[in-house]
Amino acid sequence: MASENTAGSGSRVAGMVYSLWLLVLGPSVLALEEVLLDTTGETSEIGWLTYPPGGWDEVSVLDDQRRLTRTFEACHVAGLPPGSGQDNWLQTHFVERRGAQRAHIRLHFSVRACSSLGVSGGTCRETFTLYYRQADEPDSPDSISAWHLKRWTKVDTIAADESFPASSSSSSWAVGPHRTDQRVGLQLNVKERSFGPLTQRGFYVAFQDTGACLALVAVKLFSYTCPSVLRAFASFPETQASGAGGASLVAAVGTCVAHAEPEEDGVGGQAGGSPPRLHCNGEGRWMVAVGGCRCQPGHQPARGDKLCQACPEGSYKALPGNVPCSPCPARSHSPDPAAPVCPCLQGFYRASSDPPEAPCTGPPSAPRELWFEVQGSALMLHWRLPQELGGRGDLLFNVVCKECGGHKEPSSGGMCRRCRDEVHFDPRQRGLTESRVLVGGLRAHVPYILEVQAVNGVSELSPDPPQAAAINVSTSHEVPSAVPVMHQVSRAANSITVSWPQPEQTNGNILDYQLRYYDQAEDESHSFTMTSETNTATVTRLSPGHIYGFQVRARTAAGHGPYGGKVYFQTLPQGELSSQLPEKLSLVIGSILGALAFLLLAAITVLAVIFQRKRRGTGYTEQLQQYSSPGLGVKYYIDPSTYDDPCQAIRELAREVDPTYIKIEEVIGAGSFGEVRRGRLQPRGRREQAVAIQALWAGGAESLKMTFLGRAALLGQFQHPNILRLEGVVTRSRPVMVLTELMELGPLDSFLRQREGQFSSLQLVAMQRGVAAAMQYLSSFAFVHRALSARSVLVNSHLVCKVARLGHSPQGSSSLLRWAAPEVITHGKYTTSSDVWSFGILMWEVMSYGERPYWDMSDQEVLNAIEQEFRLPPPPGCPTGLHLLMLDTWQKDRARRPHFDQLVAAFDKMIRKPDTLQAEGSSGDRPSQALLNPVALDFPCLDSPQAWLSAIGLECYQDNFSKFGLSTFSDVAQLSLEDLPGLGITLAGHQKKLLHNIQLLQQHLRQPGSVEV
């Protein structure tokens, strides 16, 4: 069935017509016109058939551009009797369709107005009719004479938009048989029609005149073709337009460009998906894109979506897709283009479980400092971690045991063989995670070589054997038995004297005893040893008020026996006199009476405190918060700034170290007082240990020296596993130095930023728990940190977090405003409660992996936000309960903030129930808003929990509240996170919203004058 497409007046550009086509990405392309027949500009005879003869005349005239062209004219209206009809036919030659499914025809013609021809009686028309006829072959000579009688399909009746009057200069051809070759330029109409679908080899087009005076100046037959195009990394060929018209589509299958592959189902799955498709409509326009292609691994998009270009040298792309190549990870390089993965540099490897974007890593270096303790026929083998871990965290140890016929060096193996099966290892021989192993089943007096290998996830990929350290060992069953018991003889603030009996089985002459001791607050691996030729020893240079663990073993010519059981003794607090066992009875009685008096006084104090609590209604007084302790004794620390001579404070509060015991190594940083270096400290009779050494700048002011030594004296007073330990000071020689334990991993904030996303919520909570425990300990001494933040906490190789920077003065440091409580900002009021606020900011830093609090907001913007009670939102992946704990620490009223012991208890509860630490959302998403704004509900207008639920947009849980009898605000205020699943509230977003509003409800109920419904 033919369809119409009318064009405006005027000429058209021959050959190609600009046409916009709309795809998903909206490109512009050119629709192609494939010409089947065109008489435009013809000057020689065309020779189409006419019926009857003379019904149409072929003449040369001037067109609208005053160019000479061949035309067909029909004008037989003058002189005809009224009512006589005209039936003049004009037929083209046979036109090959050449694959076209639909033909378009563009006609340029001129029609004379009947009114200007002086013809009446209804015999004049200003229209003509267009027909077409399909055929597989041109008409035979026998059928040419009857061509007008064949079965034609009407396309349309063509009417002129404008008919033109017959001018005097052109009237000679317009009526009757008069002809001339000199015409005035014709005024033309332009009409376009289409017909189809075409199914045979070709077709004819015919024009029927039934009484018009017209000139057919140009006839153009053509078909539309969608051009070849590149789109979405696929090429699509030229495609013939549909034969059913503009609304129908022809699908074209695309071919992926070089180094591209089809997306699966058009959305980007694995290779081998369906080829992409475009659809060509009836007007030669591409539309409706389905699917596409994507660049293969090792290739990236180029020139928009036209090409897939090889990744340049030094970059890679592991997965198919239309994303750019990435630079090679650390310690890898791609020497050639189009790399799907970057090969590791020599000596570095990537484990099979490592993703392509992971940096290459190497095997660890050998373990360090092997030593052992003989325990009868067994021994406990110890070692220190390797110096280099290879950039990985999956360090393991293997133990190789060799039995030798004589004492051999570890490097020699000529007379050694693998240990017998009787030798066993506890907990195991391979894959050890701890730096010790118990080796049992050893034969007496047989020399062994124990080799400890350090391995990690890439050790098997290295052609070299694992790095190892070895030690010669031997055991004897004739060594002394264990010392059965140990007694405390006396104690002082800095020393303890102990004694012990002989072993029950000496198995020879006792040569001496080895005493091992360590501070219970520290790791047992930091123990010290001393040798005594008698069964009594005095251990000096201890810390006042600390508990120490002791063990002793005897040595004969056969070797050391096993250590006896551990016993614990405590030094006296600073300032108390020494105590001995044979004390006088009067002293004992006096001590007992004094203790009873003290307990009575303490009981009176407690009763007074309880009475004041009931009267005031606050959780505690500021004085009690700062100065009371669970043991009912007052703890305190000495402020070094009260000393006129800082060296005197150092002598009393810190331990002087002989410089000859110190070995200084490389620089690891710089502080406000001088360079910080790694070093080794090995006092006489003690094991060597790694330390950090800060030396005071030469030529510094005396005030700088006083501050430097004052901080060391302050640090030396606190002994806690989560507080940086002072190892000693050097003040009697130059340069002045302060030695602390070495924290290998540096400040907590930078440590987390370098390892974003590598820890579980449980691990992060454990880090925060350690800091909270340290702050609980400091608060028991009424010590206020004033500068607590993630950068003031250091991390060691065992991921233990320790508080540092004690004595730091925050005055004049605007950078600490982000951690400061409101009362600090407005009144300079530093208390343990302000430390709690700072600790909440530290919690947020930990959960956000070192993100800067309040991001890029200015200090003034931060102050304004805090004053308006805006608070930091939960970091990505932060458990709800943990963020609620942060919000508790950020209470504007400091009396409502939790104590550090409450925070420690909360962390312990989370660690015991790790299922409460499930993250709310994706760890990769950033919060949608900068700060949380507390919802300002009009509580007096809310008369029930149901109304409250509607006000916060959770009315869907009204039935749940009614079912469980939650009829008052007091009931609702007692709900916790653990209660919500039992109420049927399981959506994490709803839980968070409900808990946040419960917190606001609790604040409202605590306000004076609030009425509970």
From Swiss-Prot:
Membrane topology note: Single-pass type I membrane protein
Gene Ontology biological process: activated T cell proliferation; axon guidance; ephrin receptor signaling pathway; positive regulation of T cell costimulation; T cell mediated immunity; type IV hypersensitivity
UniProt short sequence motif PDZ-binding, positions renumbered to this chain: 1011-1013
Domain Eph LBD: 33-231
Localization per Swiss-Prot or TrEMBL: Membrane
Signal peptide: 1-31
Positions of transmembrane segments: 591-611
Function: Kinase-defective receptor for members of the ephrin-B family. Binds to ephrin-B1 and ephrin-B2. Modulates cell adhesion and migration by exerting both positive and negative effects upon stimulation with ephrin-B2. Inhibits JNK activation, T-cell receptor-induced IL-2 secretion and CD25 expression upon stimulation with ephrin-B2.
Protein name according to UniProt: Ephrin type-B receptor 6
